[in-house]
Amino acid sequence: PLIFGRRMNGIGFEYMVASESVALSSMGFEVIRDLEPGEVLYINTKKEIHTNIIPEVSQSPCIFEWVYLARPDSTIDGVSVYKARLRMGQTLAKRIKESNLEIDVVVPVPDSSRSSAITLAHDLDVKYREGLVKNRYIGRTFIMPGQSVRNKSIRYKLNPIELELKDKNVLLVDDSIVRGNTSKLIIKMVR
């Protein structure tokens, strides 16, 4: 995704281009619009805007933008990331209702799955709890080199709150599964 906007300064407009709308709004820029797939934007030194679209380019959005990478207060292609995550929770709730599972508590894997988990718990009429604490000083584990480094980092990154998990049927909600190794370790920690 790519979005551009403008703001007035003392001598005219200045422009900003970013992958998320929140980058523009937090700096006081007005969003003009999202760029289309295959579109090129050029702003010359006279601040004239030129665009060109390469024909026959289909849009192929990356799901990781919606579930993991984008901030919830962003908008991508005119759709609120937060609202999209709420809808994901609603969709998941419908599927889980059909399974007749006994769930005592819904716990998000921090942070991006939180809004989906809250909606899911509400729609299932089940308690929502913060059962895992995230160490904010550990980076993104799925991009770390080597499985042993990732495993070690996951253990340092998340710590369970036993009070919220002990002797309960816990439904963990994560934003995505890349390799599945993170999920296995988190489940082991929660048990």
Residue ranges of model-derived segments:
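N-terminal segments that mediate ammonia production and transfer
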Residues: P1-S112, A121-R155, P160-I161
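PRPP/pyrophosphate-binding module of the type I phosphoribosyltransferase fold
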Residues: S153-R191
